[in-house]
Design a protein with these regions (language model features):
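Solvent-exposed, well-ordered loop and adjacent helix/strand elements within mature globular domains
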Residues: 1-315
Length: 315
């Protein structure tokens, strides 16, 4: 049986680390927002920081007292699954008007309504409406991401943070579309779901209602995107991990697959330093969800990323 993590003496990739500044920014944010986590990993953070400030030459990493563990990968050959997530920006208004008719709700006192019941008006008129968007699907995807930004057309963005869930199990609509024969499994992505919805507007609500789970939000006007560790995230310097394997605060050297605008792997990787600061319901074992950032471009890449790379845990 292969061990999930194996101590090694070197990193087999000698490429340059491309995000040294962003990584140091992420460490600085950890230090200022979570003294507990910072103290737990202080020795590792200090050693890796010294290595980065000296140029982050991978061939010299051992000289800084940094221990290295290589992840086994999903297949035992170091192929760790990499997917992406992001913070969407939803265009909305504070009251229903014109095309803005799809409510985003705060957490109710009684939450045990299915998605279909909520769509049918179970929460209507209870003063829980935080915003009205122009897209039922965008609201749904906001729930999948767990947080995001709302653009009320007032020249600023309001952060909507996760407030809770209705208590029903989550069902992947992507999986449903594959099972229904609507989309081939190998073609599945968020963009493909959006394309399907654009072609089938009358069928969209019925599809979404098959996922009984519904997410509620709270408006944090000047809030920052935070992971489950409660720490603001720096794009492409933070990941969601399986905490049972990679605890929050762990430092990772990640081969991030480079993809084109259609999601095709370009045959090369970027070497990035990242910190595990979040979790995800689908993130299990040898799998990382890489935080891509805010807005449509980040969302486009996040929706297409489903490739493999090697990962080394530094300590």
């Amino acid at each position: 049986m292969r061990m999930p993590l194996t101590p090694v003496g070197m990193v087999e990739n000698q490429s340059a680390v491309v995000n040294q500044g962003d990584f140091l920014t992420q460490l600085s944010i950890i230090s200022s927002t979570s003294p507990r986590l910072s103290a737990k990993y202080q020795s590792t953070y200090d050693k890796v920081t010294n290595w980065v400030l000296a140029g982050a030459d991978v061939s010299q990493i051992n000289r800084f007292g940094i221990g290295i563990q290589k992840m086994a990968g999903q297949d035992g050959y170091q192929n760790v699954l990499m997917t992406g997530y992001y913070s969407p920006v939803i265009h909305a208004r504070r009251a229903p008007q014109g095309k803005y008719q799809h409510p985003i709700y705060a957490m109710p006192k009684y939450k045990r309504f299915s998605r279909a019941q909520i769509y049918a008006g179970a929460l209507k008129g209870k003063g829980l409406e935080l915003a009205y968007s122009d897209s039922m699907l965008d609201n749904f995807l906001l729930g999948v991401q767990g947080s995001g930004y709302i653009d009320f057309g007032e020249n600023n963005l309001n952060y909507f943070a996760y407030a809770g869930q209705n208590g029903f199990p989550y069902t992947s609509v992507g999986r449903l579309l594959v099972e229904d024969g609507e989309i081939p499994k190998e073609k599945m992505s968020v963009q493909v779901i959006k394309d399907w919805a654009a072609r089938n507007p009358s069928r969209l609500q019925g599809l979404l209602e098959r996922n009984l789970s519904y997410v509620f939000f709270k408006n944090v006007p000047n809030g920052k995107v935070k992971g489950s560790a409660g720490i603001p995230l720096v794009p492409l310097a933070s990941v969601a991990s399986d905490r049972s394997l990679i605890p929050s605060g762990s430092v990772l050297l990640v081969e991030m697959p480079e993809i084109d605008d259609e999601g095709n792997w370009l045959g090369k990787h970027q070497l990035r330093l990242m910190v595990a600061l979040d979790v995800g319901g689908a993130v299990k074992g040898q799998h990382f969800d890489l935080y891509q950032g805010i807005g449509d471009r980040a969302g486009h890449i996040a929706g297409l990323l489903k490739h493999y790379g090697r990962v080394w845990v530094l300590n």
